[in-house]
Regions:
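Interfacial/capping segments of alpha-helical transmembrane domains
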Residues: 23-42
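Membrane-helix boundary elements
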Residues: 37-54, 162-192
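Alpha-helical transmembrane segments in multipass membrane proteins, preferentially the mid-helix core
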Residues: 75-80, 132-138, 167-168, 198-214, ...
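Extracellular/periplasmic helix-loop-helix junctions in multi-pass membrane proteins
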Residues: 211-224, 231-257
Length: 283
C-alpha cells in the first residue's frame, strides 16, 4: 500500500485542483484591457482564473469538469482494480490515466495565468511525471503478446494527421503574415499546440513504428494514446458546453475542425480500446 501513496496523493490533488477551477464558474465579473498587441482582451475576473481571458477560462473550467467527474473516477476504479489484482491490463489502464493526468498538469503549469494554487500545479506535475516514468519503465520491460491489425495502423496514422489538421490552420497564417495567433489575447503562446503537435502527434507514428517491430513499448504508447483520445473527446464536450454557457461565439469552421474531429477520434478510440483491452505477456 505504501507504494501507492504517490497515486493516492495524485488523486487528491486532481480533486482539489479541478474543484478550485470549477468553483471559479462566474460570468459576472469580467473586465477588459488592451494587451501587448494592441487588442482589447476581456478577462474572466472570477476565482483562480480571474486573470485568464474570458474565452480561455471557460475552456479551463470545462477541462476541470471532465477531470473531476470522468478522469478521477476512472483513476480510482483503475487503482482499486490494480490493488486487487495487478496484471498487465490493469497496469496499462493505470499508466494511461496517469499520462492523461500529466497532460492536464502540464497544461495548468504553462497554460494558465499564475494564480494562488500554482504550487499545487507543480506538485501534481512532479508526482505524475516521476510516477509515470517508473510505471512505463516497468511495463516496457514486459514482453507482451499482441497482434497489430491494419485498423490499428490506420487509426494511428489518422490520429497523428488529424492533430495537424486541427491546429496547423491556426499557425500557418501567423507564419506567413508575421502576426500573433488570432486568440493569443493575454498569453504569449499556446501550450496545446506544443503538446499536441510536438508530443502527441509524433507519438502516434512512434507507437506505430514500435508495434510493427513487436516492441512492448509501442503497445504501452498505443494504450496511452487510446485512453488520451477518449478523454479528450469527452473533454471537448464539457469545454464546449461551458463556452456556450459563457456566451462565447465559436466560429462554425473552428467547431467542426476541432470539436467534431476529436469526438470522432474518441469514438474510434473507444472501439479500438474495447477490442484491444486484453493483452497477454508472452512466455
Amino acid at each position: 500500500m505504501k507504494k501507492r501513496i504517490p497515486e493516492i496523493l495524485i488523486i487528491l490533488l486532481l480533486i482539489i485542483v479541478s474543484l478550485c477551477g470549477i468553483l471559479s464558474l462566474d460570468f459576472s465579473n469580467s473586465c477588459s484591457y488592451i494587451n501587448q498587441y494592441g487588442d482589447e482582451v476581456k478577462l474572466f475576473g472570477s476565482g483562480i482564473y480571474k486573470d485568464d481571458s474570458y474565452f480561455k477560462a471557460p475552456i479551463f473550467i470545462g477541462t476541470d469538469l471532465c477531470i473531476l467527474f470522468f478522469v478521477v473516477p476512472l483513476f480510482v476504479i483503475s487503482l482499486i482494480k490494480d490493488l486487487r489484482n495487478s496484471i498487465e491490463n490493469t497496469q496499462l489502464r493505470l499508466v494511461s490515466i496517469e499520462a492523461i493526468s500529466l497532460y492536464y498538469a502540464v497544461s495548468l503549469c504553462i497554460g494558465v495565468k499564475y494564480n494562488r494554487i500554482f504550487i499545487l500545479y507543480v506538485i501534481l506535475f512532479s508526482l505524475l511525471f516521476f510516477t509515470l516514468i517508473k510505471r512505463m519503465r516497468n511495463l516496457s520491460l514486459n514482453n507482451y503478446s499482441f497482434e497489430m491489425k491494419k485498423t490499428d495502423a490506420v487509426f494511428l496514422v489518422f490520429s497523428g494527421i488529424s492533430l495537424c489538421v486541427a491546429w496547423w490552420p491556426d499557425i500557418i497564417p501567423t507564419i506567413l503574415n508575421g502576426t500573433s495567433l488570432k486568440l493569443i489575447e493575454n498569453y504569449t503562446t499556446e501550450p496545446t499546440y506544443v503538446l499536441d503537435l510536438g508530443i502527441i502527434s509524433p507519438l502516434c507514428f512512434i507507437s506505430l513504428f514500435l508495434m510493427k517491430k513487436k516492441e512492448s513499448l509501442g503497445l504501452v504508447l498505443y494504450a496511452i494514446l487510446l485512453q488520451s483520445i477518449i478523454v479528450v473527446s469527452v473533454m471537448m464536450i464539457t469545454q464546449s458546453a461551458v463556452q456556450f454557457a459563457s456566451g462565447a461565439q465559436i466560429p462554425l469552421p473552428a467547431l467542426i475542425s476541432k470539436s467534431v474531429i476529436f469526438i470522432i477520434l474518441g469514438l474510434f478510440a473507444a472501439a479500438r480500446d474495447r477490442r484491444n483491452c486484453k493483452f497477454k505477456k508472452a512466455d
